């Protein structure tokens, strides 16, 4: 309630409102890239009898929201006059029987079609011209002796996506998966604490996600191209000098150990472990994974080192945006540290037994 009162009093920074509005607009742009999401929007508009014009003007409505609007809504709907509902888990009475409702179920007429079904079938269907992805649009640029950039123009909006794929994963660095998870809450040594870096990225309306699999380390950034240079600079500094958090590492260890305790009783996980052993033998993920002792002894210094070493491997950079691929343009690949001058990609090599 204290936080709600602060919102009602306007005790927040203006940039946070701007960041939230920009994020919502970016998410709407991404939804409009997806045929599935657009179909869901049309479906919701249809059965809620919404005006499509209002939906298409969503971004204008979001950007028109002011600080006074937020304070007004908080005071009106988030006041002390509220109803709290608490739910507790109980034990049902095994002998109790649920009574049948006191009304008869609606039985549709057999062999007849409802008025709604008739109207729906008679709705006009327009003709659509399919636009398939053209792989010929992908342009390839050599970054160094081993690393390349794959560029695809974004013809839909001004949202960019930058994916840096380093050619080394958990097979080469078994602890890299934990290091990647910590990178999602990391700062920059000597510059930003984790929360401060998140705020800086929010101001730029950019998001960054790090993950790893057996063969690669992935760094994925999305945002609007207007702030692409600044976002790439922060990303580059974070990769080169990550400041991993000890508290996050402690939580990660606890979560990993807790999940291992639970999976012993999970039939689906046991089934998957058996399947992997039948396919891969001693190379099964469940056999290769870190031991409990190794997880308990994880250190920030070694995880930071794994990120540094993995980012020195051969890389592929995938960029989708509106920036033209010309020598006169400063490209996003000039910001993230691209290794590969000395270390080639580690090819997948797990085979079935």
Each language-model region and where it sits:
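Peptidyl-prolyl cis-trans isomerase
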Residues: 241-250, 295-300
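M16 family metallopeptidases and their MPP-like homologs
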Residues: 1-63, 84-88, 96-97, 150-185, ...
């Amino acid at each position: 309630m204290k936080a709600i009162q602060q919102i009602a009093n306007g005790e927040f920074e203006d940039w946070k409102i701007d960041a939230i509005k920009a994020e919502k607009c970016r998410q709407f742009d991404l939804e409009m890239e997806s045929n599935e999401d657009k179909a869901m929007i049309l479906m919701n508009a249809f059965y809620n009898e919404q005006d499509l014009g209002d939906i298409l003007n969503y971004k204008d409505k979001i950007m028109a929201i002011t600080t006074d609007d937020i304070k007004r809504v908080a005071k009106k709907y988030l006041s002390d006059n509220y109803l709290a509902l608490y739910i507790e888990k109980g034990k049902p009475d095994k002998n109790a029987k649920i009574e049948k409702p006191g009304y008869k179920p609606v039985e549709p007429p057999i062999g007849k079609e409802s008025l709604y079904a008739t109207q729906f079938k008679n709705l006009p269907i327009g003709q659509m011209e399919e636009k398939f992805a053209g792989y010929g649009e992908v342009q390839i640029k050599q970054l160094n002796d081993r690393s390349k950039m794959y560029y695809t123009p974004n013809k839909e909006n001004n949202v960019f996506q930058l994916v840096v794929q380093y050619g080394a994963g958990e097979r080469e660095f078994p602890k890299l998966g934990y290091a990647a998870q910590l990178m999602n809450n990391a700062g920059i040594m000597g510059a930003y604490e984790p929360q401060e870096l998140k705020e800086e990225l929010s101001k730029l309306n950019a998001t960054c996600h790090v993950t790893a699999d057996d063969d690669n380390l992935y760094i994925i950034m999305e945002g609007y191209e207007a702030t692409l240079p600044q976002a790439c600079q922060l990303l580059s500094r974070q990769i080169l000098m990550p400041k991993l958090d000890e508290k996050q590492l402690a939580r990660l260890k606890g979560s990993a150990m807790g999940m291992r305790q639970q999976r012993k009783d999970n039939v689906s996980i046991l089934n998957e472990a058996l399947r992997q052993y039948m396919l891969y033998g001693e190379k099964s993920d469940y056999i290769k994974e870190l031991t409990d002792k190794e997880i308990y002894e994880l250190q920030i210094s070694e995880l930071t080192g794994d990120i540094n070493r993995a980012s020195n491997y051969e890389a592929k950079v995938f960029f989708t945006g509106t920036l033209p691929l010309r020598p006169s343009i400063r490209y996003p690949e000039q910001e993230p540290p691209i290794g590969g001058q000395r270390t080639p990609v580690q090819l997948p090599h797990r085979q079935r037994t």
